[in-house]
Swiss-Prot record:
Biological process (GO), any one: glycine decarboxylation via glycine cleavage system
PTM sites of type N6-(pyridoxal phosphate)lysine: K701
Keyword Oxidoreductase: yes
Keyword annotations: Oxidoreductase, Pyridoxal phosphate
Gene Ontology cellular-component terms listed: cytosol; glycine cleavage complex
Family: Belongs to the GcvP family.
Assembly and oligomerization: The glycine cleavage system is composed of four proteins: P, T, L and H.
InterPro entries: GcvP (IPR003437), GDC-P_C (IPR049316), GDC-P_N (IPR049315), GDC_P (IPR020581), PyrdxlP-dep_Trfase (IPR015424), PyrdxlP-dep_Trfase_major (IPR015421), PyrdxlP-dep_Trfase_small (IPR015422)
Protein name: Glycine dehydrogenase (decarboxylating)
Presence of the UniProt keyword Oxidoreductase in the record: yes
Organism of derivation: Bordetella parapertussis (strain 12822 / ATCC BAA-587 / NCTC 13253)
Pfam family, one: GDC-P
Length: 954
């Protein structure tokens, strides 16, 4: 494959970093004759694919985008009044251009390294403050995957926090139907008894209650007495709520709710055919240590200045594994940032004004429809009306279709309409005319909207201000907003500045051509429950991408519904569980998991109702075959599955993978192959053809969806034919599950985060079969080049046959702790002074660094990283020799801020120049960490998860 592009539109050499000449140099340096020879040395021959993938050849950016435009044009943009948790919204253009379309925001990683993540941590703290303020609760997390999964997480949080011994969780029938189905799926896996009913008739004995506030079909109830009754029996009260409605109605925390969940979608994030959108959760302080998802907290840095960080991480799956509060890993950070900035942009008066306008227009519509003789079933409302349309229902729906308008069909005799901030008076008059036409009546004029809150009972009207923190009143103009966004972005390190060599994270190029289609109206403005006749373009995209991914993986079926890798794991394990049950083997509920597995693996197994048994690793980091066989014998007929990551989390292709799969199959189990490391296999090995039964993929890793600072992601689950009937169920246009479905949905929308599926589709089309294979080969080359160049300075902990690694390598820095007192964390923080994000720390082996360069980093950037790591080793050598102090040195004090280096006095055992400019190239291009090393322990001891007063930064 020639490096030099034949035309300016040749994409492959723009995605792959090293030129052909650079690749030759690197191959010579590691002693490999060619890329093909290197792959032969790395990938076991028993699994190596020789035939090219049956995919079209690479195409130009122009061709691919034109084809996608054709596809998008097949979607029909209707005026939507469906509601049901998804609403029209205006994305502020300043946020669209400077956040959603800005690689400084969308290419960042999860802020586990807080010193280089202060900008997005501040934006997330705004979001948490907004959610806690509007819900009236003590603490909010930094986003969940969507509203339905947030409700399921509320159920599990209620079970952990309840004083009741009852196995029952009560769910109001007034919840959105898709929420009911996602909660039902979760309850079945955990053995929770779900009771769905009308809460006005009283509560059964239960450990928790889930309410909808306002109701799915429009009512606004006073739940104060119900909450008291639930608390009296030891139950936890959760409610699904609407952030915009909470500008006008009483916060759930004030009437007794313990947990509030929902979606922040209508705060500036378009439909996207169902996602991605940020789910939210807020709760009382008593539940904070059991709360799922990431949590931004305020701490201080080494200089005593306020600094932000991810708090209470010991709750999370990467630490607690099967004992974690949730399997949540990737969430929806980019969308949470947008929602929080929507509140900053509009401010408290603006948000309340939008809410008042929506409520006022709903009242005007109610009056107009009453004038047509339509019976409105709900006497209270915020934005939704339930209409008893009887035998006229089909005619009204036909009239709506003629007017390119979508209504929510509740059943054969009832419709519902929901309004939002995008609705104009002209839209509303057109809607009234639709009903007049359907009823065969003369058109009536829409009455003038009245500025009143008549639809909201006086007892539940919000009293007092909203969004009272000064940050929400800080922006007076677009100039202010632009500068605020630039200030935040400048605090962070993302791929637009530097390589992010995080092992197991695949921080590769997110090309502009891949990103462009996600904001096209034909993709962005489609409601997830729009009729199928309006979404043929989306269905062509979904079917095409599904077929491509099946070809790449060698599987027979796939679901794109899971909206994170962890959800894909969960869906795959549910499929295995349902398969065993269908075969009359419900006792198969044990999942074998290697000790080195990703933390999501055991957490997902637990959510799927499985018991986890750990399998040991051998001295080379591989699955210990003898221990595997012993564990299989130990669990016997209870064996459900083995979860294995491949290539392994130790960065090698295990030679015995087919033997491992055979052993599990012979014992009646299924093999789940975690696809987190698929970037090392595309085009060279197909897991569905070498023994695995099911895998999830991380489209936000291998297939170029950006990480967004911690989401969005898409985690499709791919299966062999025998598991295909057990893929997640797809909801219909009313949000209801097909009664023939064998497994329920795992996401609220039928196709999950469909709005970002154009990204992997474009990537695959631009690369073609040959380009995808070459990307894998170069990813492996880059990792082996780094390993070879650094091996004399840091031991490479694991290697496969021929001394090769896969697409990542583990640098063993543990001996340095003994000789110098320097830890992996010290090296990670010192890399910030060199302008780098740290590699993955202490996973899968404590005290090590795991490096994954991906194929997108060129030789010059690899050399810059290598230079930094060698220079840091020399700094450690100065400590080892006694030339530098063991406690006061450039590593222990890293990172160094400009404030530290400009201090009037300097008392350290090394010069300022070494701290700031350890290599000459930094004088030309220097990133300054905005805070010094963050005190993690202080932040957890003094937990604050909302914006600090302005005075704290003085």
């Amino acid at each position: 494959m020639s490096r030099a592009p034949d035309t300016h539109s040749d994409f492959i050499p723009r995605h792959i970093g090293p030129s052909d000449e650079d690749q030759a140099t690197m191959l010579a340096a590691i002693g490999a004759a060619s890329l093909d020879a290197l792959i032969d040395e790395v990938v076991p021959p028993r699994i190596r694919s020789r035939a090219p993938l049956a995919l079209p050849a690479a195409r130009s950016e122009t061709d691919v985008l034109q084809d996608l435009k054709r596809m998008a044009a097949r979607n029909q943009i209707y005026r939507n009044y469906i509601g049901q948790g998804y609403y029209g919204t205006h994305t502020p253009n300043v946020v669209l251009r400077n956040v959603l379309e800005n690689p400084a925001w969308y290419t960042a990683y999860t802020p586990y390294q807080p010193e280089i993540s202060q900008g997005r941590l501040e934006a997330l703290l705004n979001y948490q403050t907004m959610v806690a303020d509007l819900t009236g609760l003590d603490i909010s997390n930094a986003s969940l995957l969507d509203e339905g999964t947030a409700a399921a997480e509320a159920m599990t949080l209620a079970r952990r926090g309840s004083r009741s011994s009852s196995p029952v969780f009560f769910v109001s029938q007034h919840c959105h139907p898709q929420t009911l189905e996602v909660v039902r799926t979760r309850a079945e896996g955990l053995g929770i008894e779900l009771v769905i009913g009308d809460e006005s008739r009283g509560l059964p004995e239960c450990f928790g209650v889930l309410l909808q506030y306002p109701h799915s079909l429009g009512g606004v109830a006073d739940y104060r007495e119900l909450a008291q009754a639930a608390h009296a029996q030891g139950a936890v009260v959760a409610c699904v709520t609407d952030l915009l409605a909470l500008a006008l109605i009483e916060p759930p925390g004030q009437w007794g709710a313990d947990i509030a969940v929902g979606s922040a979608q209508r705060f500036g994030v378009p439909f996207g055919f169902g996602g991605p959108h940020a789910g939210f959760m807020a709760c009382r302080d008593a539940y904070k240590r059991n709360m799922p998802g990431r949590l931004v907290g305020v701490s201080k840095d080494a200089q005593g200045n306020p600094a932000l960080r991810l708090a209470l991480q010991t709750r999370e799956q990467h630490i607690r594994r099967e004992k974690a509060t949730s399997n949540i890993c990737t969430a929806q950070v980019l969308l949470a940032v947008m929602a929080g900035l929507y509140a900053v942009w509009h401010g408290p008066r603006g948000v309340r004004r939008i809410a008042e306008r929506v409520q006022s227009l709903t009242g005007a519509l109610r009056a107009a429809l009453a004038g047509l003789g339509v019976k409105v079933a709900n006497d209270t409302w915020f934005d939704t009306l339930l209409l008893e349309t009887g035998v006229a229902t089909p005619a009204i729906l036909a009239a709506a279709d003629c007017a390119r308008t979508n209504l929510r069909q509740v059943d054969g005799a009832r419709l519902a309409v929901s309004l939002d901030e995008t609705v104009t008076l002209a839209d509303l008059q057109a809607l009234v005319n639709v009903f007049a036409a359907g009823l065969g009546k003369d058109e009536v004029a829409l009455p003038a909207p009245q500025a009143s809150l008549d639809g909201i009972p006086a007892a539940v009207r919000r009293q007092g201000p909203i969004l009272s923190h000064p940050v929400f009143s800080s922006v007076q103009s677009e100039t202010d907003m632009l500068r605020y966004l630039r200030k935040l972005a400048d605090k962070d390190l993302a791929l637009d500045r530097t390589m992010i060599p995080l092992g197991s994270c695949t921080m590769k190029l997110n090309a502009t051509a891949e990103m462009i289609p996600i904001t096209w109206p034909e993709f962005a403005l489609i409601h997830p429950f729009a009729p199928a006749s309006q979404t043929p373009g989306y269905r062509e995209l979904i079917d095409g991408l599904s077929a491509q991914l099946c070809e790449i993986t060698g599987y027979d079926g796939i679901s794109l519904q899971p909206n994170s890798g962890a959800q894909g794991e969960y869906a795959g394990l549910l499929a295995i569980r349902a398969y065993h049950q269908a075969n009359g083997q419900p006792q198969r509920n044990v999942c074998l998991i290697p000790a080195s597995a990703h933390g999501t693996n055991p957490a997902s197994a637990q959510l799927a109702g499985m018991d986890v048994v750990v399998v040991a690793s051998d001295a080379n980091g591989n699955v210990d075959l003898a221990d595997l066989r012993a564990r299989i014998a130990q669990v016997g007929e209870r064996l459900a599955a083995l979860m294995i990551t491949y290539p392994s989390t130790h960065g090698v292709f295990e030679e015995a993978v087919t033997e491992i799969c055979d052993a599990v199959h012979e014992a009646g189990g299924q093999v789940y192959l975690d696809g987190a490391n698929m970037n090392a296999m595309v085009g060279v090995a197909q897991p569905g053809k070498f023994g695995s039964d099911v895998s999830h993929l991380n489209l936000h890793k291998t297939f170029c969806i950006p990480h967004g600072g911690g989401g969005p992601g898409v985690g499709p689950v791919a299966v062999r034919a025998h598991l295909a009937p057990y893929l997640p169920g797809v909801l219909d246009a009313q949000g209801r599950l097909d009664p023939e479905a064998k497994v329920g949905p795992v996401s609220a929308a039928p196709y999950g985060s469909a709005g970002i599926l154009p990204i992997p589709y474009v990537y695959i089309a631009l690369m073609g079969a040959e380009g995808l294979r070459r990307a894998t080969e170069v990813a492996i080359l880059n990792a082996n080049y780094i390993a070879a160049r650094l091996r004399d300075h840091y031991p490479v902990l694991y290697a496969g046959r021929n001394g090769r690694v896969a697409h990542e390598c583990i640098l063993d820095v543990r001996p340095l702790k003994e000789t110098s007192g320097i830890s992996a964390e010290d090296i990670a923080k010192r890399l910030m002074d060199y302008g780098f994000h740290a590699p993955t720390m202490s996973f899968p082996v404590a005290g090590t660094l795991m490096v994954e360069p991906t194929e997108s980093e060129g030789l010059a950037e690899l050399e810059r990283f290598i230079e930094a790591m060698i220079a840091i080793r020399a700094e450690i050598a100065q400590i080892e020799s006694g030339e530098r102090d063991r406690d006061d040195n450039v590593l222990r004090n890293a990172p160094h801020t400009a404030q530290m280096l400009l201090a009037e006095e300097w008392h350290h055992d090394y010069p300022r120049q070494q701290a700031a400019y350890p290599v000459a190239s930094l004088r030309e291009n220097k990133y300054w960490p905005p805070v010094a090393r963050v005190d993690n322990a202080y932040g957890d001891r003094n937990l604050v998860c909302a914006c600090l007063p302005v005075e704290a930064y003085a």
